[in-house]
Design a protein with these regions (language model features):
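Bacterial N-terminal signal peptides that target proteins for export
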Residues: 2-11
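N-terminal signal peptide c-region/cleavage motif recognized by signal peptidases
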Residues: 19-22
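N-terminal intrinsically disordered, low-complexity segments enriched in P/E/S/T
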Residues: 25-80, 84-169
Length: 169
């Protein structure tokens, strides 16, 4: 059955929807978005560092224009360098393990983020990444600028919906 909505009801519903999105965006900015845990031998400090999107946005941002296997055409991604985020931890990493919300895990050698401008993308085309668009955090390599990176090993490290970085000494 189709209901006719009055103009007033329609405006109320529209305002409610818009305010919900604003509230959701505010919550995402203030909730813990990334956990950096430190591992040394058999000792784990699971919650060494907890960062919000707002804190990640406060770091210097780098824009990368690149094509990916998961998007069409060249896209603009922006976020802090992975090495800058890891520098917030006191530990020097031999490698890290990136963990996605769904449990996907992949090791990333320190040579990657020390020698390549790998970012933790927070936006695509100036729009915040969402769960639907592989966010709120997506590891992005500069594939278009560095064709030698266009291989399976590097693509497998492009973790989307990143939730945790585990640092191993």
């Amino acid at each position: 059955m189709l209901y006719k909505l009055s103009k007033r009801t329609y405006l109320f519903l529209l305002l409610a929807l818009l305010s919900t999105n604003t509230i959701a965006a505010r919550v995402v900015n203030e909730e813990i978005a990334l956990i950096i845990s430190e591992h040394s031998g058999s000792v784990t400090n699971k919650h060494a560092l907890q960062l919000t999107i707002k804190q990640l946005q406060a770091l210097p941002q780098l824009e990368i224009k690149t094509q990916t296997r998961w998007t069409q055409g060249e896209k603009r991604f922006k976020g802090p360098l992975l090495r800058d985020v890891l520098a917030l931890s006191a530990k020097k990493a031999r490698y890290i393990t990136a963990v996605a919300i769904n449990g996907y895990r992949v090791d990333i050698p320190s040579q990657d983020y020390l020698n390549i401008d790998v970012i933790l993308a927070l936006t695509q085309a100036d729009k915040p990444l969402t769960l639907r668009t592989k966010g709120p955090i997506w590891i992005i390599y500069p594939w278009s600028a560095r064709p030698e990176l266009e291989q399976g090993a590097y693509y497998s490290r492009a973790v989307w919906q990143l939730s945790t970085l585990e640092i191993y000494e």
